[in-house]
Amino acid sequence: AGQLFTEDIYEPYIDNFKDRPTVVKALCLHIAHDCNLACKYCFAEEGEYHGRRALMSYEVGKKALDFLVANSGSRKNLEVDFFGGEPTMNFEVVKQLVEYGRSIEEANNKKFRFTLTTNGILLNDEILDFANKEMSNIVLSIDGRKEINDLMRPTRNNHGSSYDIIMPKFKKVAESRNQMNYYV
């Protein structure tokens, strides 16, 4: 008669892990509880998450960065991903939080690596210049060729092709970053 499970060779180590302090190295900040697309498959229900639309305040974001620093132990490099919904809908707070993060790095012996995850609809020169200066990475979302992307990712209120809006911007991101440090 065979056994369904084998012996757990890691069981003797469990107590060692229970005694270790928790160390946080990264946060994904849900900076915008809102979105400017109406993706057919969106888990967020177009930014609402079955609730109201909202934007994170600077004060809440600041507390999140303080929490990350306070709970990062001896880790020097910390990561923060600005996510949503669509984070560029709350771009002023993104800028303020990056500025705050930079202001506390030296005193806390930390280095923040910021990432912006965006659908690209609101990308403009101001956002791109800031991202190229302050964001280690930019994550750009698209759903393939034009026909599929526009079917699955329509703009809110059907304001044209999302593909036609984002593709020139995505190309500009790639060129401005020398084809590096961005993900599609």
Question: Model-predicted segments: where are they?
Answer:
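A short, flexible beta-alpha/helix-coil linker loop
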Residues: E11-P12, E45-H50, E147
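Radical SAM/AdoMet-radical enzyme domain recognition
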Residues: L65-D81, N90-V184
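N-terminal charged/capping segments associated with class I S-adenosyl-L-methionine
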Residues: Q3, I9, G47, E59, ...
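Short acidic donor-binding/metal-coordinating loop in glycosyltransferase active sites
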Residues: I31, G84-G85
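Short, histidine-centered active-site or binding-site loop motifs used for metal coordination
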Residues: E45-E48, F82-G84, R153
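N-terminal [4Fe-4S]-dependent radical SAM core
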Residues: A1-C28, G73
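Canonical Radical SAM [4Fe-4S] cluster-binding loop centered on the CxxxCxxC motif
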Residues: C28-E59
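Short, charge-rich binding segments
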Residues: K18-P21, A32, D129-F130
